[in-house]
């Protein structure tokens, strides 16, 4: 019969979406536009809509619309991309980067490349490129010829593979439907004549940032640069490395295969000759010609890929001959490389004037990287045909109403109306998947959908399974029957009709075998030439001469529709074979549907069809198998007519049960359908996944992408130690989530749930997030998710993946994505301050009140107290003397703590406000540094919340007049690393303002942002402020010493750790010199800054074998006052004109140079344990030495010695006392109140040395245990702080005899105060971020002291505020690190010289006090309950590694908490009965704990005797409560008898699971399902099955006559149902198998002994009670 006729689904008149969008925007229409449609999968944006549903046609395709040479609009989201200049060519390409797509636009002298995220790269072109073409290995650029290049450039027809590319067309009118090539004027050639021989005619671009490389051609085993400009490219594939070209001179088409060449030698030497040596540059692309054909006068108008019997073919549309020629391809895999060649036996042609590839018949199937592509062909007679390879499937026609609607719309005459009704299709275009544009003969274009995939999921599954399982010739027969159906024009009208139509195909074969037309043999009258053409010799020989002209018309006669009216024996045999293989394919679908609880109705429909097929084929076992599942079919389906035994049907449930009982390797794989074990078969992938999970769970091992048993399985990456863990990885790899697990029958899912339960408690730490979601461990899933999420795209993909693995109806109870803890804050928290004047004032500390601090401190008011103490937005309480006669001016002068609000509050005078007199002469100078410090704090608070600070934001906040506030803000932003957004012009604009504070803040901020980078531009800007770096010819600049000091430290931070020789020599000279100014008071501060900088440059590098390190150290020792026999001074790099050597006579002024030299040596030899330097920095051991060395220098030496000998620092009182020399110990021990016989000078020197040594040791202790919260260090430092506090003013009882008493009589109070506050700061450094209450009470006491209680000044108040801030660092969320860089920053911050006033920068620049920020790190840990998304308390067990002071230690913490330093952190475990245990190992790879939250998941157990109460704990839904009452009521037992029978099949697997657990084949999970429950389930089922009195009679009749009970009058047909349940429960074989076993026993055994042992041997899986019944039926005499 002729091919089936199907009606096209017309979606409407076609109009580019770009025009629709422009019309919406109100733009006037214009014809100068171009567009093409493509599949969104090309750019990774494939929609989830049904690929063949006409309603979603326009949603599943994207459009590239270009207008006015400047604008691109992609898709339906209107993503615009602008480019400048005229464009010639555009296409999508992945540039050899996998799935990432790039839009490549060819312009006059450049190639513009856009990615999907909006980034643009422009690639300059040195020669004229006339077209670009996509290849899997990159973008192919075809260059113009050397002489007289063409005046116009064709467009690359973008390959319509997947419908992704259709040629861009210039639309002169809407009705112009045929593709046209575009031409454009060519710019002048940019390449010179001498370079022309080395140029290739085709270039390949693989990276937008690289230059295009030449391509090569392989000829006779040699590689030659491709320079044939006559080979014009006409098509390339973006999926397969194929290119087609046309040579006009030779009238020849060629097909080329692109291949990579790997080698290491250059090819430039051979450019002149054009011959490439044996090895060329790595990753070059060569082309190998695999097919050629001559005879075509013009190039093929269209080339595309299609498939024919699962083989890719290249199709050429030759318009001059009106033919579509197809050439088959074959692939060969050699050394993991795929090589392409032409398959000689696949070459055919059909008549056509237009053609395009479409996805219609097998949309779910892929042939390698390609989808299954059919061909839509427009014949010369304007008929539209659908081909699957060379087989014509159907003819498509336009609906009749289409012409009527067009004619009626125009309102013309009847004659015109009749013309409209006779519509003819004149052209095809814009094919995307199953949609295409059809041009008709009235200048109209319609978008049409080609219906192929049925709407019925069951029909679609069956057709797809048949396509996968049938042999190619049988599948062609099936297609002819399917598409040749006379009712196919009604396809899609009803889901039920689609299924009935499919069933009718098989039923017609069953009733009347269909015969297929075959090619008639040639008669004797045919010529010898025609006989030769049909011979096998011609088919073989034509491979080498296969051209377009070699196709004889006689060969086309074989490409005709099948005819079902002609019968033959061969056709009858094909029909039977079709039915046999179809039975196997459909049975595989049947077994897969049995694994899905939601497709019971489809299972019944399929069983009816399978029963008819099995009956037709006399497959009695199959027929009996289906009737057992659906017993009522026995009344409608008769028995088989033959008595011969038939095949045993595969039984997936039997395989699962045997797998549970005996293991995977002992099962019979004949129980699995062949399709399930086949790789790439997506139709039965549901059953394949279940089989693979069971296989892995019971001993099968992965071997690549398959298991050792041959079952395909994708396994997610991760470690495993047992089969259960491997099963979880397999489920994660197959994306088999909890929702899919719910769809499985309960008994089948039971072993998989057992595996989940076994691994839930302690899964490995390297699993993917989806594996943890499977386990219900969303806590671990989110930890993994947040550790690896680096972009919003990744976050959305991960969210989608995690949600897909979860249970939809449980997402509101167990969310897998929770909000960040930062968003769970206390927005309305207000400060509670009884002494505040205005509670609503903003003080900049609102951010410290969040969920973390609330959880950590609870209702504790310490944070409120911290906020009150550090508040700078309110007047400060001023304690006044009791004498009321003191003037206001004196009270104002007593105010020594400068803050933003320079006002005081007098509680004794009814909280009167006292403002600072604005007439004070230096009022602005007094406010400068307080405003600077306050702005730094604001910058530190602002930057983390801002997330990203832009250059524009900084410039907009720049004041009109420079001030200290903006200077401090710049410094604060720089400490957070945000000043790298400034460019050089911004930096020099700040410098030209000539404002000291701004310059200081900017230099230090830039150095912090570019710390350790040695960035040349920043270094140049900093060295500008160091006059010693100037050359002799430079004009002298008057740079304040303050700026020079800041510049020196900034240089040190910029060059940190580099040991840059030139910079170190410069800084060494600066320690011994003063600045260009004459401010003698600031010389020490300048030298200290140079020492800081030198130490930073050579940080920890003192032990390196550097050439000039010895001389540098010797000179530093000279600055310390060491005695040297010879001069080792290193000459300066510059002239001494701008600085003079600081000397006192013939030696250096040690009072100036010693601090800087000590600091430099300390940082250079930090943690190096250098005994040499340690001995050089000795402590005075005699009275004479004590009088010669300043006491504060002794403190610096103690700090230096301890930081060098890092490992010797110990938090004990004995260690601190060991720092004190014997002469000092002896002198201090003899102190008495009545000592009159000791020299006063001697005693004062001893006490001064003692106090400074103790303070230095405490500072060393604070740095050694910075941020550790070490209890011993805290107690020790606290005791020394209380000791000095009692010496200043006795407040408590004597702490004991451990400390000497009465030292305050021999030392000034200022020294004691300074040492006290240095110890206090050290104590806060140890307890940084902890908020320790004991330390805070001490700080609050010190903060409340006035001048009457102690030496209260600017420096001491700064120390207390600094210590308070350290104690609550980052609101308790940050702490200090002890790496070299952090210690250096802390040492600079804690330099033991406190300022005496707001403007005191003589010895230490106040801005350096903020460098502690660079020593902080976030080590806080917070736990979030994944069920509620709220922070919770969780107990942790923290394990730290063994150190020199401690062995490996475990301790407990309650979150939120601060973890130990990551260098010593080994393991973190979540413990306690409330949460699932979780263990994080940090030995081999440190995870960034500061950037992720550790999530805790609670598993609460609710015990209740009341069902109502139990349900009410999680739901108040009345329907759910009623359902629980019904199921748990005792009267439900009667109904249970019927419900349990539906679960008989699944219960068998559940019982096998129970056996696997009891025998140890599955690891016990602690009572996941109680074995007594399963045993009671077995007993109850057997009681139900044995209660029927008629069962034995029906069973006897079934065994003897294979007859099912006939109970037509009974509505429920109870006897049939009970018999089927009995047969399945006791594994009764089919009667044919039983009879075969009986006959075998009777033939072998002649005696009258019992046949039960032999029956047991032949029927091993059958229950013993059934075997006894068989014995009684067939052996009654026994």
Swiss-Prot record:
Q: In which pathway does it act?
A: Protein modification; protein ubiquitination
Which domain of life does the UniProt lineage start with? Eukaryota
| A biological process term (GO) from this entry | anaphase-promoting complex-dependent catabolic process
Query: What are the UniProt keywords, alphabetically?
Result: Cell cycle, Cell division, Mitosis, Nucleus, Repeat, Ubl conjugation pathway
- The keyword Chloroplast belongs to this UniProt entry's keyword annotation: no
Q: Which residues form a coiled coil?
A: none
- Localization per Swiss-Prot or TrEMBL: Nucleus
Q: Where are the PC repeats?
A: 1089-1116, 1156-1194, 1256-1293, 1320-1354
* Major localisation: nucleus
| GO molecular function terms listed in the Swiss-Prot or TrEMBL record | molecular adaptor activity
| Alphabetized Gene3D superfamilies for the sequence | Leucine-rich Repeat Variant
Q: Can you quote a single GO CC term?
A: anaphase-promoting complex
Quaternary context: The APC/C is composed of at least 10 subunits.
Q: What does this protein do?
A: Component of the anaphase promoting complex/cyclosome (APC/C), a cell cycle-regulated E3 ubiquitin-protein ligase complex that controls progression through mitosis and the G1 phase of the cell cycle. The APC/C complex controls several key steps in the cell cycle by mediating ubiquitination and subsequent degradation of target proteins such as cyclins. The APC/C complex is required for the female gametophyte development and is involved in several aspect of development by controlling cell division and cell elongation. Involved in the control of endoreduplication.
Similarity comment: family membership: Belongs to the APC1 family.
Q: What is this protein called?
A: Anaphase-promoting complex subunit 1
Name the lineage: Eukaryota, Viridiplantae, Streptophyta, Embryophyta, Tracheophyta
């Amino acid at each position: 019969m002729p091919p089936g006729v199907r009606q096209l689904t017309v979606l409407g008149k076609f109009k580019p979406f770009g025009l629709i969008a422009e019309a919406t925007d109100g733009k006037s229409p214009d014809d100068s536009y171009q567009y093409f449609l493509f599949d969104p999968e090309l750019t990774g944006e494939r929609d989830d809509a049904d690929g063949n549903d006409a309603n979603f046609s326009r949603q599943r395709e994207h459009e590239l619309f270009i207008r006015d040479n400047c604008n691109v609009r992609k898709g339906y989201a209107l993503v615009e991309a602008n480019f400048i200049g005229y464009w010639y060519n555009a296409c999508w390409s992945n540039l050899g980067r996998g799935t990432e797509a790039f839009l490549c636009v060819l312009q006059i002298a450049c190639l513009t490349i856009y990615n999907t995220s909006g980034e643009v790269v422009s690639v300059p072109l040195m020669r004229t490129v006339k077209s670009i073409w996509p290849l899997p290995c990159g973008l192919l650029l075809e260059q113009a010829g050397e002489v007289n290049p063409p005046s116009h450039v064709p467009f690359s027809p973008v390959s319509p593979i997947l419908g992704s590319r259709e040629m861009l067309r210039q639309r002169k009118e809407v009705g112009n439907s045929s593709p046209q090539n575009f031409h454009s004027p060519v710019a002048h050639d940019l390449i010179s004549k001498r370079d022309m021989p080395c140029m290739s005619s085709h270039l390949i671009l693989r990276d937008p940032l690289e230059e295009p490389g030449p391509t090569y051609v392989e000829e006779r085993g040699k590689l030659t640069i491709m320079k044939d400009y006559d080979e014009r490219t006409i098509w390339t594939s973006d999926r397969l490395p194929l290119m087609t070209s046309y040579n006009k001179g030779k009238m020849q088409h060629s097909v080329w295969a692109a291949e990579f060449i790997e080698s290491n030698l250059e090819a430039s030497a051979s450019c002149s000759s054009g011959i490439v040596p044996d090895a060329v540059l790595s990753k070059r692309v060569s082309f190998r010609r695999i097919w050629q054909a001559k005879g075509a006068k013009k190039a093929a108008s269209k080339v595309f890929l299609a498939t024919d019997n699962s083989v890719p073919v290249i199709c050429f549309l030759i318009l001059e001959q009106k033919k579509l020629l197809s050439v088959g391809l074959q692939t060969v895999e050699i050394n993991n490389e795929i090589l392409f060649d032409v398959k000689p036996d696949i070459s055919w042609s059909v008549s056509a004037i237009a053609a395009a590839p479409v996805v219609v018949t097998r949309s779910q199937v892929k042939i390698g990287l390609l989808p299954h592509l059919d061909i839509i062909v427009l014949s010369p007679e304007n008929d539209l045909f659908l081909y699957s390879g060379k087989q014509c499937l159907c003819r498509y026609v336009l609906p009749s109403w289409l012409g009527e609607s067009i004619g009626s719309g125009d309102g013309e005459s009847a004659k015109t109306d009749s013309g409209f009704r006779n519509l003819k299709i004149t052209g095809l275009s814009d094919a995307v998947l199953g949609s295409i544009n059809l041009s008709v003969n009235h200048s109209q274009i319609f978008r049409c959908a080609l219906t192929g995939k049925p709407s019925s999921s069951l029909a679609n599954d069956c057709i797809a399974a048949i396509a996968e399982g049938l042999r190619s010739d049988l599948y062609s027969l099936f297609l002819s029957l399917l598409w040749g159906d006379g009712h196919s024009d009604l396809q899609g009208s009803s889901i039920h009709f689609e299924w009935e139509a499919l069933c009718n195909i098989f039923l017609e074969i069953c009733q009347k075998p269909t015969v297929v037309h075959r090619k008639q043999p040639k008669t004797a009258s045919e010529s010898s030439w025609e006989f030769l053409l049909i011979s096998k010799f011609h088919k073989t020989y034509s491979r080498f001469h296969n051209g377009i002209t070699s196709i004889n018309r006689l060969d086309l006669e074989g490409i005709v529709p099948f005819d079902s009216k002609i019968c033959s024996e061969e056709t009858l045999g094909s029909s039977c074979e079709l039915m046999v293989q179809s039975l196997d394919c459909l049975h595989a679908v049947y077994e897969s549907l049995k694994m899905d609880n939601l497709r019971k109705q489809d299972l019944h429909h399929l069983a009816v069809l399978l029963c008819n097929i099995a009956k037709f084929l006399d497959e009695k076992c199959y027929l009996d198998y289906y009737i057992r599942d659906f017993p009522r079919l026995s009344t409608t389906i008769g028995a088989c007519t033959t008595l011969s035994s038939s095949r045993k049907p595969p039984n997936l449930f039997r395989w699962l049960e045997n797998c549970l009982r005996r293991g995977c390797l002992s099962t019979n794989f004949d129980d699995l359908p062949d399709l399930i074990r086949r790789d790439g078969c997506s139709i039965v992938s549901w059953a394949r996944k279940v089989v693979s999970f069971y296989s892995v769970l019971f001993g099968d091992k992965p071997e690549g992408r398959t298991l050792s048993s041959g079952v395909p399985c994708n396994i997610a990456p991760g470690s495993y130690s047992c089969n259960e863990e491997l099963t979880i990885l397999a489920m994660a790899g197959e994306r088999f989530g909890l929702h899919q697990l719910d769809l499985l029958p309960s008994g089948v899912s039971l072993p998989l749930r057992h595996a989940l339960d076994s691994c839930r408690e302690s899964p490995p730490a390297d699993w993917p997030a989806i594996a943890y979601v499977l386990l219900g461990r969303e806590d671990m899933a989110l930890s993994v998710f947040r550790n690896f999420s680096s972009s919003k795209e990744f976050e959305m993909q991960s969210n989608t993946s995690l949600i897909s693995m979860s249970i939809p109806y449980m997402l509101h109870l167990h969310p897998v994505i929770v909000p960040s803890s930062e968003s769970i804050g206390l927005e309305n928290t207000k400060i509670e301050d009884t002494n505040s004047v205005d509670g609503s004032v903003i003080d900049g500390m609102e951010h410290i009140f969040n969920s973390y601090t609330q959880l950590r401190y609870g209702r504790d008011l310490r944070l409120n107290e911290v906020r009150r103490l550090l508040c700078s937005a309110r007047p400060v309480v001023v304690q006044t003397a009791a004498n009321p006669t003191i003037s206001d001016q004196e009270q104002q002068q007593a105010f020594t703590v400068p803050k933003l609000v320079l006002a005081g509050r007098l509680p004794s005078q009814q909280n009167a406000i006292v403002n600072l007199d604005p007439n004070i002469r230096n009022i602005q100078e007094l406010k400068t540094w307080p405003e600077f410090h306050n702005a730094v704090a604001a910058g530190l608070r602002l930057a983390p919340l801002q997330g990203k600070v832009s250059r524009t934001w900084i410039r907009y906040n720049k004041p009109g007049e420079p001030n200290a506030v903006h200077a401090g803000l710049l410094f604060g932003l720089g400490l957070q690393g945000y000043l790298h957004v400034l460019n050089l012009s911004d930096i020099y604009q700040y410098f030209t303002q000539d404002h000291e504070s701004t310059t200081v803040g900017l230099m230090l901020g830039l150095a912090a942002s570019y710390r350790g980078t040695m960035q040349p531009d920043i270094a140049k800007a900093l060295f500008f402020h160091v006059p010693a770096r100037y050359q002799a010819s430079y004009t002298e600049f008057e740079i304040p010493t303050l700026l020079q000091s800041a510049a020196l430290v900034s240089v040190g931070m910029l060059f940190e750790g580099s040991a840059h020789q030139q910079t170190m020599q410069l800084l060494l000279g600066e320690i011994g010199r003063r600045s260009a100014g004459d401010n003698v008071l600031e010389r020490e501060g300048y030298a200290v800054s140079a020492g800081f900088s030198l130490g930073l440059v050579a940080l920890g590098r003192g032990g390196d074998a550097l050439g000039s390190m010895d001389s540098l150290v010797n000179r530093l020792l000279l600055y310390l006052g060491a005695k040297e026999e010879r001069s080792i001074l290193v000459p300066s790099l510059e002239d001494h004109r701008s600085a003079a050597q600081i000397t006192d006579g013939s030696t250096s002024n040690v009072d100036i140079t010693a601090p800087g030299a000590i600091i430099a040596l300390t940082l250079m030899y930090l943690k190096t344990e250098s005994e040499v330097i340690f001995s050089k920095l000795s402590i005075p051991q005699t009275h004479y030495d004590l009088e010669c060395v300043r006491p504060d220098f002794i403190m610096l030496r103690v700090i230096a010695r301890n930081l060098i000998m890092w490992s010797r620092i110990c938090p004990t009182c004995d260690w601190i006392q060991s720092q004190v020399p014997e002469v000092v110990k002896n002198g201090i021990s003899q102190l008495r109140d009545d000592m009159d016989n000791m020299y006063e000078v001697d005693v004062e020197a001893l006490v001064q040395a003692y106090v400074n040594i103790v303070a230095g040791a405490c500072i060393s202790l604070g740095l050694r245990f910075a941020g550790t919260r070490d209890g011993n260090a805290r107690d020790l430092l606290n005791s020394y702080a209380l000791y000095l506090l009692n010496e200043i003013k006795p407040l408590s009882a004597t702490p004991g005899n451990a400390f000497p008493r009465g030292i305050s009589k021999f030392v000034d109070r200022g020294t004691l105060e300074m040492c006290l506050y240095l110890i206090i700061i050290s104590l806060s450094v140890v307890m940084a971020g902890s908020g320790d209450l004991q330390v805070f009470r001490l700080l609050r006491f010190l903060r409340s002291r006035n001048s009457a209680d102690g030496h209260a000044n600017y420096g001491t108040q700064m120390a207390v505020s600094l210590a308070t801030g350290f104690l609550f660092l980052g609101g308790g969320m940050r702490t200090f690190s002890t790496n070299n860089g952090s210690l250096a920053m802390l040492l600079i911050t804690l330099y033991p010289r406190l300022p005496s006033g707001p403007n005191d920068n003589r010895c230490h620049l106040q801005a350096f006090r903020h460098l502690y920020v660079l020593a902080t790190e976030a080590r806080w840990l917070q736990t979030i309950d994944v069920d509620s998304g709220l922070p919770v308390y969780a107990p942790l067990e923290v394990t730290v590694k063994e150190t020199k002071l401690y062995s490996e230690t475990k301790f407990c913490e309650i979150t939120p908490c601060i973890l130990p330093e990551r260098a010593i952190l080994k393991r973190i475990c979540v413990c306690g009965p409330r949460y699932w245990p979780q263990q994080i190992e940090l030995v081999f790879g440190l995870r960034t704990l500061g950037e992720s939250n550790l999530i805790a998941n609670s598993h609460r157990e609710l015990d209740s005797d009341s069902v109502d109460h139990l349900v009410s704990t999680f739901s108040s839904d009345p329907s759910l409560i009623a359902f629980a009452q019904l199921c748990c009521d005792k009267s439900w037992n009667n109904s249970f008898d019927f419900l349990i029978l539906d679960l008989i099949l699944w219960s068998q697997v559940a019982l096998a699971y129970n056996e696997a657990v009891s025998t140890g084949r599955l690891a016990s999970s602690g009572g996941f399902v109680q074995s007594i429950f399963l045993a009671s389930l077995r007993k109850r089922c057997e009681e139900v099955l044995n209660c029927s009195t008629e069962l034995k009679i029906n069973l006897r009749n079934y065994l003897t006559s294979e007859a099912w009970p006939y109970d037509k009058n009974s509505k429920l047909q109870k006897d049939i149902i009970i018999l089927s349940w009995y047969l399945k429960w006791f594994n009764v074989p089919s009667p044919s198998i039983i009879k075969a076993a009986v006959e075998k026993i009777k033939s072998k055994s002649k005696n009258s002994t019992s046949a039960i042992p032999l029956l047991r041997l032949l029927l091993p899986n059958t229950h013993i009670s059934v075997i006894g019944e068989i014995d009684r039926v067939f052996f009654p005499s026994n």
